[in-house]
Amino acid sequence: MKLKYVFVWMVLLLSSISVYAQPKNTSHASQVWLAYFNQTRLSNKWGLWGDFQLRTREELVSDLSTGIARVGLTYFVDDNVRLTLGYGFINNYPANDNITVSQPEHRPWQQVQWFTKNKRTRLMQYIRLEERYRKRYLSNTELADSYSFNFRVRYNILYQIPLHPAGLVARKLSALINDEIHVNFGKQIVNNYFDQNRLFLGLNYAFDANNNLQFGYLNTFIQTAAGNQYRNINALRVAYLQNLDLRKGK
């Protein structure tokens, strides 16, 4: 129970920082984030990870900002702890009408994910390390042959609370409180060690034990590489989560 209150206070603190203490030099956007997440267990110890995402740029449905395809190989320490090694390809679409070429990114990643469950609630956390290789721009119309590189670490915590007396059961809604902070590091990082914070408040509908639909409000607060410029994104996030167990007898 104490962990629950610590989490709630942490979310409130991060929300206050991102919403009420925004610097003056902040741009704003409204977006839609769509995603599909899959975790497939192949055996007692091994499984696969896959997620695919698409995000609009502004005014909810105007143009695209980001496309993500990410895969990974997962090792199950036990039913509640998982280690994943993976690769992601990210396509950053032109950020404005003056840029005519997309910026590709190659992103190897490593992750430890763990779950804390009881009869009524569910807590998920992960720490992810990413190695980000992004194509440099020569101009608004041309990419360079070289890449910029930096590390990024992400900490994600999600708390799921049932809205039905029976608890977290199929064909019922539950509430979600989720926060993820991103921190940059590496030789090429000068001004923005803090990268971004994502606060999500939403609902989960469980079709069954393995298929869930999540939807709700996402606030993303980003510090750009310049260090003194920020971006605040208000988004509708919709995600389909599928967990498959291919072990015999499961």
PLM regions: where:
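Residues on the lipid-exposed face of transmembrane beta-strands in outer-membrane beta-barrel proteins
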Residues: 36-40, 71-75, 110-114, 129, ...
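Bacterial Sec-dependent N-terminal signal peptides
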Residues: 1-26, 240
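Solvent-exposed loop/turn segments connecting transmembrane beta-strands
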Residues: 23-32, 56-66, 187-194, 225-232
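Residues that define the transmembrane beta-barrel architecture of outer-membrane proteins
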Residues: 28-32, 65-67, 104-108, 147-155, ...
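Outer-membrane beta-barrel transmembrane domain signature
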Residues: 127-212, 221
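Transmembrane beta-strands of outer-membrane beta-barrel pores
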Residues: 52-58, 87-93, 116-118, 129-133, ...
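Short loop/turn motifs that connect adjacent beta-strands in outer-membrane beta-barrel proteins
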Residues: 42-45, 80, 117-123, 163-173, ...
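Transmembrane beta-strands of outer-membrane beta-barrel proteins
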Residues: 48-50, 83-85, 121-127, 153, ...
